[in-house]
Curated annotation (Swiss-Prot):
Similarity remark: Belongs to the TrpC family.
GO biological process per UniProt: L-tryptophan biosynthetic process
Disulfide bonds: none
Protein name: Indole-3-glycerol phosphate synthase
GO MF annotation terms: indole-3-glycerol-phosphate synthase activity; phosphoribosylanthranilate isomerase activity
Reaction(s) catalysed by this chain's protein: 1-(2-carboxyphenylamino)-1-deoxy-D-ribulose 5-phosphate + H(+) = (1S,2R)-1-C-(indol-3-yl)glycerol 3-phosphate + CO2 + H2O
Domain of life: Bacteria
Species: Brucella ovis (strain ATCC 25840 / 63/290 / NCTC 10512)
Keyword terms: Amino-acid biosynthesis, Aromatic amino acid biosynthesis, Decarboxylase, Lyase, Tryptophan biosynthesis
Pathways per UniProt: Amino-acid biosynthesis; L-tryptophan biosynthesis; L-tryptophan from chorismate: step 4/5
PROSITE patterns, sorted: IGPS
Coiled-coil intervals: none
Stored SUPFAM superfamilies: Ribulose-phoshate binding barrel
Matches recorded under InterPro entries: Aldolase_TIM, Indole-3-glycerol_P_synth, Indole-3-glycerol_P_synth_dom, Indole-3-GlycerolPSynthase_CS, RibuloseP-bd_barrel
Length: 268
């Protein structure tokens, strides 16, 4: 996404945040987070898969995208969550942004309740209020996109997540963002293989940036991962955890496609 697109997203997000705060005061929202059961360990679930010698998949529930339009017409978040779990995914990622991705908070809540997998709120975050929202909807992890926030806001979002017992996935797409991300505490780093300005996707981005990450960080390959062979390629660079959405969302049998992607049992 270009800088201009990110600015437009931030503009409508800040309008959404203001409207949400007008509807529900922060203190009341915080009370709702206390009604939730404790977060399931998102990072812990990924590390458990890797420790068992398996690829760790964050499987994404995504109805549409700005670049591809409608991805899955028969969109059923609980059924998709169960299919991903059956196929061997470690965690879920659920789009909650409506204007760009046709996502919704209720998709996250429904998917999270349908299975035992920890869930990420996949959205553009610009205010700690949104972290409390995520927790109140049942999310176990948030996404912090370094391209869209400054260092102070990134730390504020991360601190809020940690205070709520959540994990934070820090997303980067170039060396400068990786350097900034490494100043944060989270061990969960996502490398987006999509150039946010040209939309070009290249797995070499993950391969290049992986060299910058200390061994205590868990790297997640994002975008452009379609086959088991793609997973094997990134594993050579030390990346065995992946966030994958579109390629699985387009499959008729999501559970079988997930299993094939992770194990190479059959071609997708």
């Amino acid at each position: 996404m270009s800088t201009d697109i990110l600015r437009k997203i931030e503009a409508y997000k800040r309008e959404e945040i203001a409207a949400a705060k007008a509807r529900l005061a922060l203190d009341e929202l915080k009370a709702r987070t206390r009604d939730q059961s404790a977060p399931h360990g998102f990072l812990k679930a990924l590390e458990a898969k890797r420790a068992a010698g398996q690829f760790a998949l964050i499987a994404e529930i995504k109805k549409a995208s700005p670049s591809k339009g409608l991805i899955r017409p028969d969109f059923d978040p609980p059924a998709l969550a169960k299919a991903y779990e059956e196929g061997g995914a470690a965690c879920l990622s659920v789009l909650t942004d409506t204007p760009s991705f046709q996502g919704a908070p209720e998709f996250l809540t429904a998917a999270r309740q349908a299975c035992s997998l920890p869930a990420l709120r996949k959205d553009f975050l610009f205010d700690p209020y949104q972290v409390y929202e995520a927790r109140s909807w049942g999310a176990d992890c948030i996404l912090i996109i370094m391209a869209s926030v400054d260092d102070d806001l990134a730390k504020e979002l991360e601190d809020t997540a940690f205070a709520l017992g959540m994990d934070a996935l820090i997303e980067v797409h170039d060396e400068a963002e990786m350097e900034r991300a490494l100043k944060l505490s989270s061990r969960l780093l996502g490398v987006n293989n999509r150039n946010l300005r040209s939309f070009e996707v290249n797995l070499a981005v993950s391969e290049r940036l992986a060299k910058m990450a200390p061994s205590d960080r868990l790297l997640v390959g994002e975008s452009g991962i379609f086959t088991h062979e793609d997973c094997l390629r990134l594993e050579k660079s030390g990346i065995g955890t992946f966030l994958i959405g579109e390629s699985l969302m387009r499959q008729h049998d999501v559970a079988a496609a997930t299993r094939a992607l992770l194990t190479g049992a059959e071609k997708l």
